[in-house]
């Protein structure tokens, strides 16, 4: 008898929608585990359902995460509706806005690793089958995506959303739209006598009008856009603000999507391919996004076992134009991107130009090209997002540098440069505080190349962001006249002439450790070169006398971190 189509279909092995949770639900010996699960609400009929971890970085410390408790509830509704059983758990999150400019910032980047480790720990210990990962601020986004890549289960990422811009009423009677970055810059302006204290107060009270992540194309919004481009979040979900009820719909659909991924046997690494990372880099370059995206995409790729390097950023950045007129260098915020159609507008423009891979799989189960065809986003509006025929800059908004000062690499947000070359005289500081003191004393002047070292992943430790000093430099009116270089990082809200992630870092005997006041430093953005103009023999003599400083932390999480963390050039990953 010939085999029928239905018989053939029956012979095809379907994916197990409970690939792990059977370890805690099936068999006589699992009676104790089932008893525990009954206590949290599961009944007999629920033990046949896939168990979905709903991991959230919700807390009350920062507005970035305030909406996540509401969104997690909606995710669980979606999981239930699709036939799964959701189990919610929490992880940490650090507020960079609150931690900036003091000892607390040492603990920011390590929180990325703690988040990834903690999510992995719960998912592995409880044998959960899949996950929806919710995050709202800078390090929680990559931390969640690193966990997804490491676990390689059915996973969907969901962003909390951006804050709305505030409006400050200033002493001259004017009104000004502001974000949190304006507060850092106002401090520098006030210190130089360029702004009255009452205006600083007005800005302080206006910058955060409600819940959501910092509103420009800073680190959180950059990484949310990258997650959408990677295919790890639902199309169109990055741009709507945190207070927009469309987010509840995205949350419910994210819960449904993860169960469907289980049914189809699609896991995170099926989505997180080399081509998907290239798509994410292209979108970050076109938006002129945060330099932190370089660090984080390298780290996520490491967890996904994808070979990604700084050379990939250089290659893609050289052919993808900068299209978005968004803060910190531009005029618009993420809400404006949402108003003109969101991240799909950018992705469709890049796809049409052959700068995006449309065949990459996404959490919808469809490809990038299929998703965009279904959405049919409009063309760029010409103001918030430029057409490819009329870019802000012909190349991407981030440039990878190499040279005698950065043999392994460095990163600059070239979207903010008006000229390609800067040559200045080194003013060398061991740590950010000393540089801030010099700025406040008026001893940093036009033409200086301010070097802040021993702020790398190991030397900091924790690779602190330098928003306090960059904001103060801009506020003091020196943003276009002073070059800032560091083995640390910059906030996604940083503006000005800023080179970060210099590798090797000072504590690892990188060239930045041997700089002295008065050395000449040359930055050539067009040719992607960062050099110190000192005779090599002189530099070698300084190297032989080098002794690294002792570790700043002898106990606790940072003492462990220093022993494990690698170079910024490979994402500052541990292990």
UniProtKB/Swiss-Prot annotation:
It catalyses: (2R)-2,3-dihydroxy-3-methylbutanoate = 3-methyl-2-oxobutanoate + H2O; (2R,3R)-2,3-dihydroxy-3-methylpentanoate = (S)-3-methyl-2-oxopentanoate + H2O. GO terms for biological process: isoleucine biosynthetic process; L-valine biosynthetic process. [2Fe-2S] cluster binds at residues 64, 137, 214. Residues 1-25 are annotated as: Disordered. Homodimer. Mg(2+) binds at residues 96, 138-139, 465. Its cofactor is [2Fe-2S] cluster; Mg(2+). It holds the Pfam family ILV_EDD_C. Belongs to the IlvD/Edd family. Its EC number is 4.2.1.9. Keywords: 2Fe-2S, Amino-acid biosynthesis, Branched-chain amino acid biosynthesis, Iron, Iron-sulfur, Lyase, Magnesium, Metal-binding. Binds 1 [2Fe-2S] cluster per subunit. This cluster acts as a Lewis acid cofactor. The active site is at residue 491. Pathway: Amino-acid biosynthesis; L-isoleucine biosynthesis; L-isoleucine from 2-oxobutanoate: step 3/4; Amino-acid biosynthesis; L-valine biosynthesis; L-valine from pyruvate: step 3/4. The lineage of its organism: Bacteria, Bacillati, Actinomycetota, Actinomycetes, Mycobacteriales. HAMAP family: IlvD. GO terms for molecular function: 2 iron, 2 sulfur cluster binding; dihydroxy-acid dehydratase activity; magnesium ion binding. It comes from Mycobacterium avium (strain 104). The modification N6-carboxylysine is found at residue 139. The keyword Amino-acid biosynthesis applies. Functions in the biosynthesis of branched-chain amino acids. Catalyzes the dehydration of (2R,3R)-2,3-dihydroxy-3-methylpentanoate (2,3-dihydroxy-3-methylvalerate) into 2-oxo-3-methylpentanoate (2-oxo-3-methylvalerate) and of (2R)-2,3-dihydroxy-3-methylbutanoate (2,3-dihydroxyisovalerate) into 2-oxo-3-methylbutanoate (2-oxoisovalerate), the penultimate precursor to L-isoleucine and L-valine, respectively. Residues 8-25 have a biased composition (Basic and acidic residues). The keyword Lyase applies. This is Dihydroxy-acid dehydratase.
